[in-house]
A protein has these predicted regions:
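Thiamine diphosphate
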Residues: 256-277, 282-284
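Acidic, glycine-rich active-site loops and adjacent beta-strand->loop/helix elements
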Residues: 75-76, 224-227, 251-256, 285-292
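Short acidic, glycine/serine/threonine-rich loops at helix termini
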Residues: 80-84, 129-132, 231-234, 257-263, ...
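Short glycine-rich loop/turn motifs
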Residues: 38, 104-105, 203-208, 300-301
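Conserved beta-alpha junction segments in alpha/beta enzyme cores
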Residues: 176-238
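Beta-strand segments within the central parallel beta-sheet cores of soluble alpha/beta enzyme folds
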Residues: 72, 244-251, 278-288
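Phosphate/diphosphate-binding loops
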Residues: 114, 121-122, 278-307
């Protein structure tokens, strides 16, 4: 810790960082505001699995203060890439990684899947406009049990992943293990169920993106636990631009527990290519914030597992 010298092993140490937080002097993303800042609200899927039949944004675009209403078509026209998968864990055959985009195209695959991003002068205006967006869905069969998802006739979630299997992970010597079981006098079996888990930090995720038209660069302020990795993912996979043209900053983080290590779509929404998502006319900064309930619906979770 800063300002401490000497041998501290085996001794109680006085923490140096707590006073600032306990006296309300912490600075979180929601404490920041940029002149001319716009506000973004995302409309999410209420279905676990459905086809997107139609999106009507006309009423939302006509509402007061609305700067833009964006769908997956805007991702395509701006050349915004899919969010990368950083957990390459397959050991048997190459891992199948379907493209996870910042806004769903044609199909939603989980409750909370982002579909439309609305930008307006104020957060209430953006929220009202999001409610005016009309999305027609055709519900599809869905499963919530991983074992059922691997069944022969289970509904297919991704065309790229036959049988809903992304990867197989194995470690150790299977032959030696089989031989040990063959020699064992007794074999005991037990099923362990690891329940669904949702990480719930006090501070939900938030992001503020600023575009510098003169330099052609982005500045992204977010609730993150690994700015260097997030910056590299945005540059290489999402915006396809030189690393030095993207700055990612994280102020104080109100709890993370690992869930804020990942790149979420909010970074794409708040920046967008050439500042077009923030404002088609002047590249105004854009902010997207989540309350606790949407945070749970839009955060990486650990599903129920069987061992």
């Amino acid at each position: 810790m800063r300002g401490m010298t000497g041998d501290h092993i085996g001794h109680s140490l006085r923490r140096l960082e707590d006073q600032r937080f306990l006296t309300g002097r912490g600075h979180y993303v929601d404490d920041f505001a940029v002149p001319g800042q716009l506000h973004g609200i995302v409309l999410r899927s209420p279905h676990g699995h459905a086809l997107i039949e139609r999106i009507d944004t006309a009423a939302a675009r006509a509402m007061p203060g609305v700067s833009g209403v964006f769908t997956a078509a805007d991702l395509d026209s701006d050349g915004i890439g899919a969010l990368p998968c950083i957990a390459q864990v397959a050991t048997v055959v190459p891992m199948i990684v379907p493209p996870r985009r910042a806004l769903a195209r044609d199909r939603v695959r989980h409750v909370g899947d982002p579909v439309v991003f609305v930008v307006a002068d104020t957060a209430p205006q953006a929220r009202d406009a999001a409610e005016a967006v009309a999305v027609e869905y055709r519900p599809m069969p869905a499963v919530v049990d991983a074992r059922e998802a691997l069944a022969a006739r289970a509904p297919l979630l991704w065309d790229e992943a036959p049988g809903n299997l992304s990867y197989r992970f194995e470690r150790g010597d299977k032959g030696a293990v089989d031989a040990a079981f063959a020699k064992a006098a007794h074999i005991l079996e037990i099923e362990l169920v690891n329940n669904r888990l949702v990480v719930a930090p006090i501070e939900p995720r938030a992001a503020i993106g600023t575009y510098d038209a003169a330099a052609g660069s982005f500045d992204l302020l977010l609730t993150g636990q690994g700015v260097h990795s997030l910056r590299r993912q945005l540059a290489e996979a999402v915006f396809h631009m030189p690393l030095e043209r993207i700055t990612v900053r994280a102020p104080d983080v109100g709890g993370g527990f690992g869930v804020k290590n990942f790149l979420y779509p909010s970074g794409c929404w708040c920046c967008g290519r050439r500042g077009g998502w923030a404002s088609p006319s002047n590249g105004s900064p854009s902010a997207a914030r989540s309350s606790s309930a949407p945070h749970r619906a839009a955060t990486i979770i650990r599903g129920r597992a069987w061992h």
